[in-house]
Amino acid sequence: MELQSRPEALAVELARHQNGDLKKQLHERQPRIAALSDKQALGTITAVPVTGPQVSSLQRLAGQGAAVLPQVRPKTLIPDSLPVAPGRDRPPKQPPTFQKATVVSVKNPSPALPTANNTVSHVPAPGSQPQALAEPAALASPLSSAGVAYAIISTSPSNAAAMAPSTAVSVVSDSIKVQPLLISADNKPPPRLLSSPHPATHHCPLHPSSLPLTPPSPSLSPSPLHGIFQVIIIQPQVQTQPESTAESRPPTEEPSQGAQATKKKKEDRPPTQENPEKIAFMVALGLVTTEHLEEIQSKRQERKRRSTANPAYSGLLETERKRLASNYLNNPLFLTARANEDPCWKNEITHDEHCAACKRGANLQPCGTCPGAYHLSCLEPPLKTAPKGVWVCPRCQQKALKKDEGVPWTGMLAIVHSYVTHKTVKEEEKQKLLQRGSELQNEHQQLEERDRRLASAVQKCLELKTSLLARQRGTQSSLDRLRALLRLIQGEQLLQVTMTTTSPAPLLAGPWTKPSVAATHPTVQHPQGHN
């Protein structure tokens, strides 16, 4: 049943869409649109294709959401001369497949109204007729602060070629809806107009009698749920008038007047009254107060002024506390002026002809601050080559260092000097500890080497002891064997003696040589056995 009722409803909607009364009302509205002023008519036409959702009458009958068209929210007031289109209070009767919108934007002579930059928001289209009609009626004021644009939207692509030559804005079809759009004065870019996928822009001059419409792009094919409508924005040209120029000058002069006012405020601002307790506290800590800072700056300027007379001797005009040992060594001219109280640029120094160390002459190196001269070999440490430029002897260097140590330090400089001294002492201590640590490390390495040598010597001694013990045991065994042999020989001699005493005749009858040899042998070997 729904499928059979849908064509009938579609036929009814088409019949309502082609209404003669609506055509008549639109033709009556055209002269009022053509009666716009030249300010609203002159301008350039900008055609920007914008994609927007399209809701057909079938979808509207099915109960789906109403169509939403991107439109500029009215941030300014709507003039009384703008008509309210009657087509806004009735829904469209034909499913739109292509939409065209012609927007005639009016620009105020004020330069603070850019019509190209607008804020775009979604305004419900034909669904909210009472609210849309109530807004223009409530916000009625003369056209003085914002531009006004007319949006002529066509929902019938077949009647898009119908145009009225006698009107200021072309009539697109019978079902054209004329909607006044307000261009806001803020400079926010329209996100939906600029983010369209096909930004085709055409510029052409506008005549008050006709407004040509740009044909739609063939590549912009409609979709079943989204249609493509084209917005033509006419930006009027600003006419230079004496009143507008006079009105536009004060905004440019305001920043300069504001800058002058801030300068006057800074100049007229009284000097800050410092707390006496704060000043006393700063003085007690040695900090620099405002008055002391101004005094230091004035003295510095005076020193700069005086030093420009002779830049070579600018170091002589520095204060005592700013002189360091390095400055003394690097600037010997100052040493002469301070040590001898006789500036070297007034009287030339007559140097000695003999060395101050060995009292001999020839090949002397003169000092730049005193009359003394030295041999290069007599210096400590001795120099191999003569130094270039002005040379300072060790005696003058010691004088300068002693004089620099006696300079009193006051205020903040005393704190800085004490900190520098403390840091120097700590650094020296650190260097001494590092040196002592390196010495101890070297000593430790030497002791380890000595320990290794002693360990090897002890090992050798133990090996020698074991070898000597082995030899001693061998010698003792050999001695035991010799003693046994001696006892055996002595026993044989006693046997021979006893035999001779018992039978002397037979023994003397024959020659006997062996006992004599055996008798002599024990006499020789006996002392060895006792040893």
UniProtKB/Swiss-Prot annotation:
One annotated GO molecular function: zinc ion binding
Compositionally biased tracts (Polar residues): 522-531
Coiled coil regions, renumbered to chain: 423-465
PHD-type zinc-finger residues: 352-399
Transcription regulation recorded as keyword: no
Lineage top rank: taxon: Eukaryota
Regions of compositional bias (Basic and acidic residues) in chain numbering: 265-277
Positions of region (Disordered): 79-99, 184-222, 238-277, 295-314, 507-531
Record carries keyword Coiled coil: yes
PROSITE patterns for the chain: ZF_PHD_2 (PS50016)
Alphabetized UniProt keyword annotations: Coiled coil, Metal-binding, Zinc, Zinc-finger
SUPFAM superfamilies noted in UniProt: FYVE/PHD zinc finger
Protein name: PHD finger protein 21B
Species of origin: Homo sapiens (Human)
